[in-house]
Amino acid sequence: MSGHKCSYPWDLQDRYAQDKSVVNKMQQKYWETKQAFIKATGKKEDEHVVASDADLDAKLELFHSIQRTCLDLSKAIVLYQKRICFLSQEENELGKFLRSQGFQDKTRAGKMMQATGKALCFSSQQRLALRNPLCRFHQEVETFRHRAISDTWLTVNRMEQCRTEYRGALLWMKDVSQELDPDLYKQMEKFRKVQTQVRLAKKNFDKLKMDVCQKVDLLGASRCNLLSHMLATYQTTLLHFWEKTSHTMAAIHESFKGYQPYEFTTLKSLQDPMKKLVEKEEKKKINQQESTDAAVQEPSQLISLEEENQRKESSSFKTEDGKSILSALDKGSTHTACSGPIDELLDMKSEEGACLGPVAGTPEPEGADKDDLLLLSEIFNASSLEEGEFSKEWAAVFGDGQVKEPVPTMALGEPDPKAQTGSGFLPSQLLDQNMKDLQASLQEPAKAASDLTAWFSLFADLDPLSNPDAVGKTDKEHELLNA
């Protein structure tokens, strides 16, 4: 009996454990979903159940910290490599610049710049040696993330699933226990079935819980080992770099020790640098102006003398201008008294004499002037030669291209427009009148002389043997003149 009683629960447990009906699965999934919903919404769970998993929660926090810090470390290593390359490039450029400037400067300062530039170029090359341990460090961190952390993460996910099943089975057992009545054996089979599910879920959960705790501990230890090994390599390389750089810089400092190219002065008051620049520019302008004034002083004196002479001449011209114009008007009035041949020869217009005579109010010629005018009038009016054979020969040789233009005649009652300006002409008005007449004479075609004897009478002095009076005469008239 005892053996039979002892063997009964195990047989019953095996029977309930093998119960995989659809109803049992649906009930199990229902309580698992309810537990997941409680966890997602953050509702308060049973404090005793939560306290039993305190050590597991601590390990999970450590795992999430390792996962997060490894990701940040990988990003920091990549950024650090970029910054080292950028710093080495800038340091190399600075070294090249100092060397180029040092070659141009032949003083000791140029030698200092050359030595410093070489040291900077050497330092930039040695700094790039840090990339080798950093690249190795980055590879190790990435391997650690993709292998160790990923494997632990899968184990944690399986553990969380089993914990949800276990806590769901506890909720299911709690609900069934409320309807249980041990005295009447009511709901006993149902309670035993749920109790069997709780035991199986706890067994799986405890196994995965142990795996997670062990893997998290191993993960933390492996990370410490990785960091200590890789950081030791990086630290050694960094120390070698600073040692070489410090020796190079110290050697440059010792070689140029005692060289002091600067002279220091103490300022009593601060001044604006812009004000100093403005004062320097003003001084330069003043000095340039003084030098230019001294250089231009002698030529300016000569120019001033010439200007004074021109002013004197212009003043004398202004004072004598009126007198010269009046004398010209006097001569014009005397010419109007001459006979027709003179007017034809000189192309003088009767209107000019009419306008110049009354305006100028010239007196009659005196003494020798009267005798000269009378002599000229007698010479030109001595004989009136007609156009004869000479005029035909002249036309045959030179052509009859001279066209006579009719002189515009004015009515007797119309006054002369040139004489309407008034009796008192100013010198400027007389000059303008002469210029207008001159332009009109240039624009008009030259008039043909009606009588060619006037020309021969003027040029008779050139050939005294020829007789100008015989031009255009017949043979009988020649004989009479010769007699």
UniProtKB/Swiss-Prot annotation:
Pfam families listed in its UniProt record: Arfaptin (PF06456), ICA69 (PF04629)
Keywords: Cytoplasm, Cytoplasmic vesicle, Golgi apparatus, Membrane, Neurotransmitter transport, Synapse, Transport
Stretches assigned to the AH domain: 51-254
Principal localisation: cytoplasm
Listed GO MF terms: membrane curvature sensor activity; protein domain specific binding
GO cellular component, one term: Golgi apparatus
Membrane topology of the entry: Peripheral membrane protein
InterPro entries per the UniProt record, alphabetical: AH/BAR_dom_sf, AH_dom, Islet_autoAg_Ica1/Ica1-like, Islet_autoAg_Ica1_C
Start-end of Basic and acidic residues biased regions: 308-321
Segments of this protein annotated with the region Disordered: 281-321
Function: May play a role in neurotransmitter secretion.
Protein known as: Islet cell autoantigen 1
Organism encoding this protein: Homo sapiens (Human)
Encoding gene, per UniProt annotation: ICA1
